[in-house]
Amino acid sequence: MASVLCYADARGIPSHGCNRADTYVNEIAAGLVDACAEPTVERVEGCCALVDGRNGPGAVAAGLAMDTAIRLAGEHGAAVVCVRRSNHFGAAGYWANVALERGMIGMSMTNTSPMAVPTGGKTRAVGTNPLCFFAPADGDDSFQLDMATTVVPIGKVEVMDRIGRVCPPGWGVDRNGNDCSDAREICVSGGLHPLGGGADTAGYKGYGLGVLVEVMCSVLGGSDARDIGPTIRSWSARRDGPLGYAHAFVVIDPGRFAPGFGERLGGYLAGMRDLPGDVRVAGDPEREYERDAAENGILLHGNVARALKGLAARVGVEDLPGALEGLDGLGARSSLYE
């Protein structure tokens, strides 16, 4: 799990980085997540498999599922693996990147607790349900799409709340379904807009994508009825039972199709970047941020660093990186490799 958190912060995705550490620890401390659970591969049929997360940490179940998908894709050319009875698995891109590093196309997705208000509705009923697609190109290049199916992931709103800032217009709504910029209100009582916003700006497309992810994860994976869509428990240490999250992973070996995939993709991406203006492709900003983090360390907001120090004291961790010990009001840098 620590690797997943560092991956996110190192790529400039603080919503899924160390900002979430206390939530993971609180879940285990409250007995809501079984830290000792060992996920199992329940079923394998050709290039398809089903994993039971057994209410353990989501990252552990996701690791087993992606390893299984890569193995099956190596045998069959492509693979689909679903996971049920799991928990939050961190940034979806971390798991797609595992396939990318093996020279394969990787897709990862997960359902989440309902945070989005569907088009035409007034109450939250769909998760942020992220969808991720990574594809390798020649020259160490790649296409890396990692997106929530809401305007923003809820973690971004949580970060805005933690650092005391208001949200930009269009991110979410209050308890009455009206547009809202108060981060706490969006998180606690309101909800997020689907990707695209309201009906007049094609928010129904984001809503549809969110449902697509739900179908691929919980419906295809055989989750219990209460672990699908609107009835999934809130991701909180105060909830009354397991989350029952579900994930799906797709891995494709491009070498099983037309030769020259990496060269063609590399040429396509280069052509997009060469367009007039400042055109980048999915994954470029994160790679730039990661290069800086590898050289200078991961930048944490001061409030997040302070929360980490408090968490460390609570669980008895004493040997913190020096940057965290000497943090100031602007934040702290901790080495990517510490």
List each model region and its residues.
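Residues forming anionic-ligand binding surfaces in small-molecule and nucleic-acid pockets
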Residues: V41-D52, L64-A79, V173-L192
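N-terminal glycine-rich anion-binding loops that anchor highly charged ligand groups
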Residues: M1-G17, V33-V44, R239-G244, R280
